[in-house]
């Protein structure tokens, strides 16, 4: 478990914090997942708590409102932002809603034996099953969404298809299909924090800097300990690249250090 020990230890020796301190990488996760993401489960099963097919449907918060453009971009460019967006909603949860047209496109994690969801044959019935959510507001939002779908553009989940909504204050820019084919399913999600975007400021050689931008002798940082790498966005997998690049820099810098 990452509990920020590195940041605390750095601060104790005068390290400068840096970057988007209140930002984080957060993945939409099953609201009712096992504690700590199921650390006692095999790694192959833990990943099944992810729920990142929101782009094939819509997400509603407790007020029954949409709060992100689910089709803004490919999920690899949006999932970390949208996980944080879920955490910022009332109650720190949301519902991902789909109809039968996309059921075979949902990732295997949605069919995991421990996946939590509700199902109904009508949108009215589904909205009544959305625990913690205003059912009338939810139905109104879904009606407005359905009415706004652009039928002139074909649906293509393999590209930014431009199949959008029209006239909504918050659009869906791609992959907008009407929710009109039962059964309808809704999956409750929260945001699972992987790491924070804020961290310690480092030099080009990986040395941790103090508040005067002077290196702290013998102290180096790499990976998610380094602040200022990510801000409002996160391309999938780039955290691994960051760890590799900054890890190499820090290792080489430490090897050349007189301490």
Regions found by a protein language model. Name each.
Residues 1-33, 240, 246-249:
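Glycine-rich loop(s) and the adjacent beta-strand/alpha-helix scaffold that form part
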Residues 13-22, 66-68, 135-139:
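Acidic/polar loop patches that form or flank catalytic/metal-binding clefts of enzymes
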Residues 36-79:
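Phosphate/diphosphate-binding loops
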Residues 52-54, 194-196, 236:
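Short, small/polar residue-rich loop motifs at catalytic or cofactor-binding pockets
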Residues 65-94, 215-231, 235-237:
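Gly/Pro-rich active-site capping loops and adjacent beta-alpha segments
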Residues 96-156:
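N-terminal leader/propeptide and maturation segments of large enzyme subunits in energy/redox metabolism
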Residues 111-115, 233-238:
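Short glycine-enriched, charge-decorated loop/helix-capping segments at active-site entrances
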Residues 137-233:
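A glycine-rich dinucleotide-binding beta-alpha-beta segment and adjacent secondary-structure elements
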